[in-house]
């Protein structure tokens, strides 16, 4: 055999770009054809090899001694003999020829191996799932388990380090499989779940099959406690998004949310924003964690995790870290002992472990009640809007973050025809480049001026349609008053006279063209503008006569007879 064996057009770990693969006595390597980072694997780390049909021809799957899998796809059928000699002579490993099941059945047996989960149909593999591709698993029903896959890793060529350690596969396409569910009824033992002989140990306890599958997968895929030592744990923390109560386990590189139904494992690298927001009730604080990629629960995505803490809840906590780590890796980031309000402790630990800045509301804005949160709603969902230094933040659901840099303009408006139109208003935030808009409704009118001043302070374009509408309405009302003031004055007041007076007395001195108001007819002391002294004397005499007539009528008017049964 030659000192080096080369193969062209080979794909590493489902990568989109092909490359050249070279085998030598001390190991193997792969380099992309277009240039880039090369992958190498030492011969001492090769624990086994399998040959099978794959997407681009034939595939060599290399099982690593350090719990991992390397896939090389794109070989031709005639390469089998050549590769078999390479693995046998140089790596002392047999290249096992494995045939996949092509029956298309969706029922079979799951087998946990060292590096991957295999679904077998009639003792042949239908598909395999490397543990490194599994990001999370949850019990989705009574006999059902959901297995979630790792998302796009940001376009890296492969997830392996130079020594072939555990890592994600090549960057995925725009559309990719994100979840698979297994229905596992009945009971079983741990040995059966791992592919052992049933009944080999009489003392082996039977458990629910789906629960045992779940526990085994968590252990194999290193999800949860097996991912490392817990630095801190917070129990029964209320989460508004996703809704429920979760225990928070914080590790060196990730944290875990453990609930009754769902568990989430989140890398600190996925944290893009971290905010501490006081609720307007002065009793609670909200901790908002922005994630990219977002948290996924079935078909629902959660770009923000929103926790709620009581403002007066104190905690005493000692971190599970050594003095050496505290003075080295976490110097000036963490303390060994905390005795403070719970929300502050959680925020400090997240800041130290994730190395993220903690964002709080801007000091330049408060509501008319001297609060930072504005009560409002997005469509039918009520919540609170916070003005940060560089963005808006609406919580709890749907949690919405809008950067000032992406804001084109802001419009203040009032809902026409609404009963509360005079006491509330709406804010519409228009995004740049036609990215749409977001509307925040039912904001207290007393916060209008403070918001307008804050937006102008931040250099945002503001259009106040409320003032424009008010001016137009005032102008329209002013014209109507000028045009109909006389009619409105005479109309309703002319009917206030006495019926007896209308029938029995005629005002002979009334002039239709007179400008005097009807009030003059009843007010003896009223002086009509523009009338002479003679007209005043006449009016006074008429008033005196009317009074005398009223007195006479009062004396002559008989009493009403009482009805008798």
Curated annotation (Swiss-Prot):
InterPro entries xrefs: PH-like_dom_sf, RTT106/SPT16-like_middle_dom, RTT106/SSRP1_HistChap/FACT, SSRP1-like_PH1, SSRP1/POB3, SSRP1/POB3_N, SSRP1_DD, SSRP1_sf
Domain of life of the organism encoding this protein: Eukaryota
Region (Disordered): 151-173, 477-565
Residue spans of biased composition, Acidic residues class: 478-489, 500-522, 532-553
Subcellular location: Nucleus; Chromosome
GO cellular component: chromosome, telomeric region; FACT complex
Keywords in alphabetical order: Chromosome, DNA damage, DNA repair, DNA replication, Nucleus, Transcription, Transcription regulation
UniProt cross-references to Pfam families, sorted A to Z: PH1_SSRP1-like, POB3_N, Rttp106-like_middle, SSrecog
Coiled coil: none
Keyword DNA damage: yes
PANTHER family noted in UniProt: FACT COMPLEX SUBUNIT SSRP1 (PTHR45849:SF1)
Subunit architecture: Forms a stable heterodimer with ctc-2/spt16. The dimer of ctc-1 and ctc-2 weakly associates with multiple molecules of nhp-1/nhp6 to form the FACT complex.
Other facts noted in the record for this chain: In contrast to the orthologous protein in animals and plants, this protein does not contain a HMG box DNA-binding domain. This function may instead be provided by the HMG box of the associated nhp-1 protein in the FACT complex of fungi.
Family: Belongs to the SSRP1 family.
Name the UniProt record assigns to this protein: FACT complex subunit ctc-1
Organism in which the protein naturally occurs: Neurospora crassa (strain ATCC 24698 / 74-OR23-1A / CBS 708.71 / DSM 1257 / FGSC 987)
Gene name linked to the record: ctc-1
